[in-house]
């Protein structure tokens, strides 16, 4: 009887541990942190105590930080030096680093994939070498600074290609060769252990779009093969398309895993605390979630459950929860933050990372 009494609490403790840590990567993109601090922002925890943002995140269950990397931005924001500085703080706080290489001097997304200044726009052979050398340089720089990198995404939301015009979707062989070169920039770097290599597309709920891209690059006859990358990342935003249901996301993630054999992650997502005038109708199976701090927790938990219940589903990252000078985060919703932009104080929704 005594043995059973001892084992029962241990079993309950083990179950609680498994329930609260089902995702290997429980992350946030805080790329804007150094810019916000330069503007005088001083972050506070939920109790109103001033603390570095990375410490606040860690205390709330975040274990990984996503950082966007631009090649040669005009003001230095998000360049390599910027990201090394940020990553040192992330490492010191005990979280892993995930680098999101945009291969651009500015934002890269489905509508913008501008080739960096000085990179070739008319010769794919030259461009692929530039991609390889740049990717290797980034990774080598992190290695020389003693910073391990868990994940490197080779491009950001590249459903419509990358490094335009050579990497436009009218030439999937070019896209495939660019991705192959980027992957080997990571593989040939001095980082040890080697980071996982990710390909990242937007509209993660749209299985047909995901399938079309991967089938196109993998059957293009170019150099990219499945062994070049380890992870598939998707963006999942609820406020851009009423078709972006959790049900559709579930189908897409499961199909991505079963078709291509890669672990899958939702690497960008948000939920509003205020959205009085949405530009699009919200998906039908999300309409019961309120636009509130409590609603943020519910939404993240539901998305995390979709990921966790997908074979090979290993992570979720919230996009820019603390960018207090940009509360809308590019959407038609007024406020998608987990930090109150009026007070710079963490909202209680941030604690959701300790539950997923």
Curated annotation (Swiss-Prot):
Signal peptide (UniProt feature, chain positions): 1-21
Domain of life according to the entry: Eukaryota
Keyword Glycoprotein: yes
Protein name: Probable arabinogalactan endo-beta-1,4-galactanase A
InterPro entries to which the protein is assigned, alphabetical: Glyco_hydro_53, Glycoside_hydrolase_SF
Enzyme Commission code: 3.2.1.89
Annotated active site: 157 (proton donor), 268 (nucleophile)
